[in-house]
Amino acid sequence: TPSDGFMGMR
């Protein structure tokens, strides 16, 4: 999940 640390949507 690349967006896990960013927003956690993917």
UniProtKB/Swiss-Prot annotation:
- GO cellular component term, pick one: extracellular region
- What are the annotated disulfide bridges? none
Q: Which UniProt keywords apply?
A: Amidation, Neuropeptide, Secreted
Going by the entry's taxonomy, the superkingdom of the source organism is recorded as Eukaryota
Q: Which GO terms describe its biological process?
A: neuropeptide signaling pathway
Which sequence ranges form a coiled-coil region, renumbered to this chain?
none
- Residue list for modification Arginine amide: 10
Q: Tell where it localizes.
A: Secreted
Keyword DNA-binding included in the entry's annotation: no
Q: Does the keyword Secreted apply?
A: yes
- Report the function annotation for this chain: Myoactive peptide. Increases the amplitude and frequency of spontaneous contractions and tonus of hindgut muscle.
Please give the name of this protein: Tachykinin-related peptide 4
The species this protein belongs to is Rhodnius prolixus (Triatomid bug)
